[in-house]
Amino acid sequence: MKRRKYVLTAVMFLIAALVICFTLPQLAEPRFQVENKIRSLLHRYDLTSRADAYEIRQIMTQDPSTSRTLMWQSQDEDNRALAEIRKKGEKASQVVPATSSVFTDNGVTRHLHTAMVTGLTPGTSYEYRVGNDRKRSPWMPLETPAQGSFSALIFPDSQSADYSGWKALAQKAFKDHPDVSFFVNMGDLVDNGEHAYQWDAWFDALQGVIERIPVAPLL
């Protein structure tokens, strides 16, 4: 009886010691790190809003079969901006920290975020999303080209005006050619590069396109 009581006491002491060992390191960590670990385990994030991520786009790199530049903007400052990418149909993903900068156009302040994704496999379907340690955008497709032929759309000057013509042209072109590998806009992209409204209008014309088909922009 005494031996059984001794063994039970020893087991309870061991359990208490393990709880303390696993709890104290978490208490020593910054709160956001602990929260992020919990969210990562649960794979649950709030959806981003325009304050967190908008005008998301893919940018061509020197070798788009193995790398891609992802860019987006936020209204709010975000020092924890990141991109997340995975092969389509898989759960395992890679998180890529973004570099951030701030700029002001015509009195409108924007925070620009850039994530460089490398080590991709040619001819593979991926999906990505952007955000921070608490929020993520919906998943969006990202395709890496295989060796061989490709197709592209090449646009001249957008002839901006109110950008309605540019929007109609771009949307019809991508509707007629949904499988292009990338597109080029030779410029001018906008009439006034220091006017926030014009950039918003240019990106609005490409909504549903530029986040899934990479662009090679020429200012």
Q: At which residue positions do the language-model features occur?
A:
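Active-site neighborhood of divalent metal-dependent phosphoester/pyrophosphate hydrolases
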Residues: G148-L169, F174-L219
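Acidic, histidine-bearing metal-coordination/catalytic regions of metal-dependent phosphoesterases
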Residues: K2-I154, K175-D176
